[in-house]
Amino acid sequence: MKKLDESNPEPRGELQLRILANRTDANISGDISGGWLVTQMDSAASIVANRIARGRTATMAIGDMSFIRPIKVGSVVCCYTHLISMGRSSARIMVEVWSRMPEDELRHKVTEAEFVYVAIDDNRRIRPIEPRISRADSPD
């Protein structure tokens, strides 16, 4: 399992998704479920992938993921994304998750993972991505 990068005290990338974690999103221990969080991360990454591909995409892989801290019910959960690289028909997107309580400005990194998407056509077959990308999508 890869070591989670905690070296940067600020989120990397563009804020793609901000959502309030509710009681219905909690696991039996009372913390927000990891499965719920992965769903939010996939949604955030898909926004970027669909924009880059100018159309439909499919999640091909999710890289290793570990959690630094649990998310409390009532937390504001933010998913930040940045494009790592592009292939002929794929995009690698890093998603960082940060959380904070609504009344607090102090945010904490929760997790990060790399998501790989492929562009697909209407028949769900892999298709090439047009080579042009916007500055907002370009890798660092």
In which residue ranges do the predicted regions lie?
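Catalytic strand-loop segment that frames the active site of acyl-thioester-processing enzymes
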Residues: 1-34, 51
